[in-house]
Every structure is written in structure tokens, then in C-alpha cells.
Amino acid sequence: MHAQDKGGVLPGLSLLLIAVAMVCPSQAAYKLQERYSWNQLDFAFPSARLKEQALASGDYIPTNALPVGVEHFGNRLFVTVPRWRDGIPATLTYINMDHSVTGSPELIPYPDWRANTAGDCSNSITTAYRIKVDECGRLWVLDTGTVGIGNTTTNPCPYAINIFDLTTNTRIRRYELPAADTNPNTFIANIAVDIGKNCDDAFAYFADELGYGLISYSWELNKSWRFSAHSYFFPDPLRGDFNVAGINFQWGEEGIFGMSLTPIRSDGYRTLYFSPLASHRQFAVSTRILRDETRTEDSYHDFVALDERGPNAHTTSRVMSDDGVELFNLIDQNAVGCWHSSMPYSPQFHGIVDRDDVGLVFPADVKIDENKNVWVLSDRMPVFLLSDLDYSDTNFRIYTAPLATLIENTVCDLRNNAYGPPNTVSIPKQAAPGHSAVGPPLYTTTNQYRPVLSQKPQTSWGPSPPSRNYLPALNGNPGIPGSLSKLNNLGAPGQVVSSVSVSTNTVGPSGIEVPKAYVFNQHNGLNYETSGPHLFPTLQPAPSQLGGGLKTYVNARQSGWWHHQQQG
């Protein structure tokens, strides 16, 4: 028996252990799971013949399509494809996740082909970038009305907000931004949606990246206004140099871009966090200000500058969960970062939830859905714009993972660090001199918050393998066969990046310097102070007025538009 162990069983066991050792590190190192991937994008044409005609005419040029935005709702995963180059047949698309659980699915135009006709301003969307689904089952899409990029840009249509009812798949509103809200340099690529006490109490905020402004839109008033007189919207002249995928380039003119909204605070409003693209710093303002049209020229001191994230910390996309965890892309680092908003905004309180020098090259968009699942789209954008993509390789990927899994064992996971549950802080609130109070009754107290923290925790992140091609773990997702939850690790070895170690500061009232934090003061804005984290008590938004919850099924729609084009 012992001889058999040495000659038969043990070698087999050794091979098994080696195989496990090869598989487990990849699974352990990667938290984001690859769901979809493409060498080049494909679209769900009504027929093979129409697809061939589109290819022959140049209406469809597969290598010209780049995905930039992602959003999840029910059984649909929305993907936007801007018309930067010729041959983009649809700009607002989705994947039917019931029909395509993984792989490289065709993109289905939403809500149909006709609604994606370039230049049909009143009836269609010409170019969409980032999009947002709100808790009322509405999809918010800003049509930039542009075709081309940079010096090739033309403007066949004005900027227009399009809102779709996702239960009926119909557009329920279109609002053109007035000339006063834009300027000759305007380029708007990002959106944040703020739902207040009900679905009619809704605002959308738009970041004018190259026109250096912030636009507010009120659903109830069907009106918009622009905040533009603030230097925080401008790029940092010292942060215009970028390095992505071995390409050095300069985006020195890129201003306000990424935005996220906190949960509702005790005063009934949220905080909007934002960053210029050419910057490593985050800024903040209360939506109390943004919702008030009278404050557009009288709000300079209501905007507050936070600390920098650290080196190589450019970001284009950010989102915050309803319990205060902010996720953001780190495009220089091929990574997704995190910050818990109950902690000071300083590098020692920022974590890395995932990094991949192949799969996460330019993680263009980051979203958290209604089930607290995270979705990340990576697209190698600088390579697409400044060099040439290898279309025999996988270029575009969509990843997903539960938020709790991503932040586990990072400084953003307050359940497992030395800080314990955050203490409640209440900040005096009143209207600024000369301005009436807007919104719900104010919450006041004179108690000052002092954090008491124990020994500083140490959080380290190991390096991630350079590629991954396995299926995601899908346990718990409705409508998805359980057999697909097994991982199929096909990753290949490659260069390993250096590990990163981050530790937090020891903070306490015993004479040790406390990290800087930001809290709302009595002047209706934000104040810079050093007494510890800003811990805003949160109230949950009013539940959706829609009966029956979110719709979770949609059929692929074919309007017959392509047949009409062929006949015409």
C-alpha cells in the first residue's frame, strides 16, 4: 500500500495540488468576474442580409465602435457606443441577459433601430455617453447631438435629455438644453441623477468637461440652469499628463468629469462629489445649492476642495452606494478604487478593490445597481484613440461582482477594520444670509463629533495576474442557471505588477494630528475642519411609486426601419 502511495496516489495528489495552486491564486486575486468580452463590437441587425448591406455601404464598420458607458436594470445591461467615427449603427444599446448569460453578445439598439438614427434630432439619439437608471425605473440619457471627436466633431443636433420608461420602453420626455446652459466649448459626457422625496422630485446634473460648468435639470419644473463661475470645474495645470497602456499623452484641457451622489442626509439633501479629469483632487457641494436656480452666481463658497487621492489618480467615473461607499476608476493604474465617505478624504483611507494590467486597461465606467452589484466596463480607450487596437485580442470587457465582495478586507470595509461602526454626527444647518431655506425642516445640534479610533489597521493588496478569461460566479442571480456559477480558469501567466501596501493613520483626541475632513456648516455649504470624519446621518429615498417592482424582461424590438431604408 505504501509503495502504491508513493508510485500512484501521491503523484496524482501532487498533480492535483499543483492544479489547485495554479487556479486558486487567480480566483483569490480577482474579485471582479468577467461577464462579457469582445474583440470588436457586433450589433443585432434585423437580418444577415441587412448586416451585409450595412458593412458594404460603410454604415457599419466594426473596428470603429468603442463602448464607453454601462448600466444595469433587471435582465438588461445597457451599453453606449458614441459616434466618434463613421460606421456606428446604434449608440444606445443593451444586452438581453436572459438570452446571453456570458460571451460576446450582439448589442441590441434601444428602444429600437429608428430611435438610434443619427441626425434625426427630435425622434432619435445621435450620440450617448454615460447613462443612468434611477430607482423609479427611468433611464436618463443625454444626447450630445455630436458626430466625430476632437477636430472632426460636428453638431447636427442640440444637447438633449432623453428619459425612457423602462417598464414600457418608451421615451417619456425630451428636453433640449437652452443656449444659456452651453457655450462654444461645451462637451458633456457624464450624468448624475438625484431622486428626492418622490419620483417627481428628481434632478439631473451634467458635467461640462470642456466648457467648465455644471448644469442642473429639474424634472418637476422641466427647466435647467448652469453653474459656471467656479475654478473647481477647471483642470489642474499640473495634472494633465497621462500614462495608460504604455502610451504617454496629455489631456490637459479636461475639466469636471466624474460625479457621485451621497445618500440623502439628515437635512434632506445629498452631497455631490466631482473631479476634473485632469486632476487628482475631489470637490464637493450640497445639492441644496444645485437645486436652487437663484444660487448659480452666488455660491462660490458653497463648493469645497477635498484632498488629493495621491499620485496617478486620474478618474473619469465614480458612483456611491446607498451606505456611503464610493467606487471610482483609476485609469492610470488599471484599477478600481474605493473610499468610505464616513472617513476623511485622504490617500490612507483609499483602497484598491481590483487591478488588472490587461483586463482593466482603462476601466471607463463603474456602476452599482439596485441589488448592490458592481459593473465595470473596460475599453482600452487611449489605445483606440491614439494607437491601434489588435482586433485579434480581447479589447472590451464587462466585469461584475457584489459590492460587499469587492470592498472586503480593504480600508473601505468598516465591518472588518479597527474603526468599528461610525458615530453619528449632527451639524447645524440654516439658510445662508439673504437666502430663504429650501427643502425639509432643518436638523440642528451643537454636539461636536470627536472620533475615537484604536490601533491603526494595516491593509495590503497583492498583485493581480495580468489576464483572466473565466466565467463569473453567478450564484444568487435570478434567472441564471446554477451550473454557470463554476469558474473556468483559462488565465495565462504573465508579468506581475508590484504589490501596493496602504495603511491608515492613528486618529484620536489625545494630541495626535487628526486627518482633515469636511462637514456642512451653518452657512449652507461645506466647511474644512480637522476634527475627524464627516459622518452624515442618512435617510433612504422614498420607495418607487411603480407597482410590482422593476420589470425584468424585455423582448428585442425591430421597428422595420432597416427594411424601410432598403426599400427607400
Curated annotation (Swiss-Prot):
Could you tell me which InterPro entries the record lists for this protein? 6-blade_b-propeller_TolB-like (IPR011042), Royal_jelly/protein_yellow (IPR017996)
Record bears the keyword Secreted: yes
Localization annotation? Secreted
The record's listing under Gene3D superfamilies reads:
TolB, C-terminal domain (2.120.10.30)
Q: Which residues are glycosylated?
A: 151, 222
- What's the family? Belongs to the major royal jelly protein family.
- Kindly name one Pfam family recorded for this protein: MRJP
PANTHER family in the record: PROTEIN YELLOW, PROTEIN YELLOW-RELATED
The keyword Secreted appears for this protein: yes
> What is the name attached to this protein's record?
Protein yellow
Membrane-spanning intervals of the chain: none
A single GO CC term for this protein reads:
extracellular region
Origin species: Drosophila guanche (Fruit fly)
**Protein function:** Controls the pigmentation pattern of the adult cuticle and larval mouth parts.
- Give the signal sequence positions: 1-28
Q: Which UniProt keywords apply?
A: Developmental protein, Glycoprotein, Secreted, Signal
Predominant subcellular localization, coarse grouping: secreted
